[in-house]
From Swiss-Prot:
Enzyme kind, highest EC tier: hydrolase
GO terms, biological process: proteolysis
Propiece span(s): 31-129
One annotated Gene Ontology cellular component of this protein: extracellular space
Tissue expression summary: Expressed in the hippocampus, nucleus raphe, and cortex.
Residue ranges constituting the Peptidase M14 domain according to the UniProt record: 138-432
Domain of life: Eukaryota
UniProt keyword Disulfide bond present: yes
Chain positions carrying an annotated carbohydrate: N89, N153, N427
Disulfide bonds: C265-C288
Cofactor note: Binds 1 zinc ion per subunit.
UniProt-recorded name of the protein: Carboxypeptidase A6
Cofactor field: Zn(2+)
Length: 437
């Protein structure tokens, strides 16, 4: 096709059209996140001895790896499953070190950029903003999620009320959906998703939960009982600034986006910023670390807003559920110490039944137990804070998977993940209504 006409003026006018046409014909020419992850790898290793663990921690620190699992290099010890994202310019050095030290490893993701683009539909031309045909089996941007919330608030006013509890560091509204049949005195359940920005399956589940509640309210006796007897306060995206940043700049961003007066590094771990054994074991005081606890408890506007809301309503809120990824675990207090909670039997029974219900769908197994022994010790967590502040049922879900995809859980796994998790949440809620005060 010739784009140039006889006259230069006409040719100049047609050049932009030709360029656009060629871009459409070659969609692979542009890459997500400016191709920043090309050649990056995700590598798993499990140190067999403390000597290996020490050596791995040292090389990981030197190469500035992005730790996927566990959340801090300090957790790496003998037998710890460790997944690291290593940039292309450091992968050769890391692999050479592992081979020379005779440390066994496995490359989980050979090229992070290719995996990212293959497993995501961010670069397609699908109409993702059509609220009438909202697709719950794809990941949605913050703008799309908040538009969806506004839409539900208008179209389902009998069961949904939307409100804001404050603003984020960058000025974004912190929206909540109050779900349930309206009544004066009702117990409540709090659900939040997306405390850590890169854990996209969390917000996907929060949306799925709302969808299922609205669709099955009339047909499912259990759901009808839940919404008639309880309110659900649902925060689909807790860390709104970080989540937005993970869509526009860095897919694997974890923290909030607050600035630090002394360091160029931005953000605080919103799950280390709560006033419960703040900045103790499992949290970092360095602003550049992913587990940075912040300059003081509740320093982050997002954490402060949620803490204030929970404090105000703690007499009625009987359960706190927070959704994370990845590990396939259902955790309960304590995170910050090795100790048994007073209502252990009730909470442990609920967790046991929840993971069994979850497994009954697709056979996916979740570990369950106190966070400190099942995962690792961490201080300043939202779950521990909720429990310490009078909410007797406090759980944290670590959703799929166990590392094959990690934070890049494909969209084709959203439906099965949310379907099985829905059963677990319903089980916990019904257990709360039947047995525990």
């Amino acid at each position: 096709m010739k784009c140039l006409g006889k006259r230069r003026g006409q040719a100049a006018a047609f050049l932009p059209l030709c360029w656009l046409f060629l871009k459409i014909l070659q969609p692979g020419h542009s890459h997500l996140y400016n191709n920043r992850y090309a050649g990056d790898k995700v590598i798993r290793f499990i140190p067999k001895t403390e000597e290996e663990a020490y050596a791995l921690k040292k090389i990981s620190y030197q190469l500035k790896v992005d730790l996927w699992q566990p959340s801090s290099i300090s957790y790496v010890s003998e037998g710890t499953v460790t997944d690291v994202h290593i940039p292309q310019n450091g992968s050769r050095a890391l692999l050479a070190f592992l081979q020379e030290a005779n440390i066994q490893y496995k490359v989980l993701i050979e090229d992070l950029q290719k995996t990212l683009e293959k497993g995501s539909s961010l670069h397609t031309q699908r109409n993702r903003r059509s609220l009438s045909g909202y697709n719950y089996e794809v990941y949605h941007s913050l703008e799309e999620i908040q538009n969806w919330m506004h839409h539900l608030n208008k179209t389902h006013s009998g069961l949904i009320h939307m409100f804001s509890i404050g603003r984020s560091y960058e000025g974004r509204s912190l929206f909540i959906l109050k779900l349930g049949r309206r009544s004066r005195l009702k117990r409540a359940v709090w659900i939040d998703c997306g405390i850590h920005a890169r854990e996209w399956i969390g917000p996907a589940f929060c949306q799925w939960f709302v969808k299922e509640a609205l669709l099955t309210y009339k047909s499912d006796p259990a759901m009808r009982k839940m919404l008639n007897h309880l309110y659900f306060y649902i925060m689909p995206v807790f860390n709104v600034d970080g989540y937005h940043f993970s869509w526009t700049n860095d897919r694997f961003w974890r923290k909030t986006r607050s600035r630090n007066s002394r360091f160029r590094c931005r953000g605080v771990d919103a799950n280390r910023n709560w006033k419960v054994k703040w900045c103790d074991e499992g949290a970092s005081m360095h602003p550049c670390d992913d587990t940075y606890c912040g300059p003081f408890p509740e320093s982050e506007p997002e954490v402060k807003a949620v803490a204030n809301f929970l404090r105000k309503h703690r007499k009625h809120i009987r359960a706190y559920l927070s959704f994370h990824a990845y590990a396939q675990m259902l955790l309960y207090p304590y995170s910050y110490k090795y100790a048994t909670i007073p209502n252990f039997r009730c909470v442990e029974s609920a967790a046991y039944k929840a993971v069994n219900a979850l497994q009954s769908v697709y056979g996916v197994r979740y570990r369950y137990g106190p966070a400190s022994t099942t995962l690792y010790v961490s201080s300043g967590s939202s779950m521990d804070w909720a429990y310490k502040n009078g909410i007797p049922y406090a759980f944290a879900f670590e959703l799929r998977d166990t590392g094959y995809f990690g934070f890049l859980l494909p969209e084709m796994l959203i439906k099965p993940t949310c379907t099985e998790t829905m059963l677990a949440v319903k089980n916990i809620t019904m257990h709360l209504l039947k047995k525990c005060p």
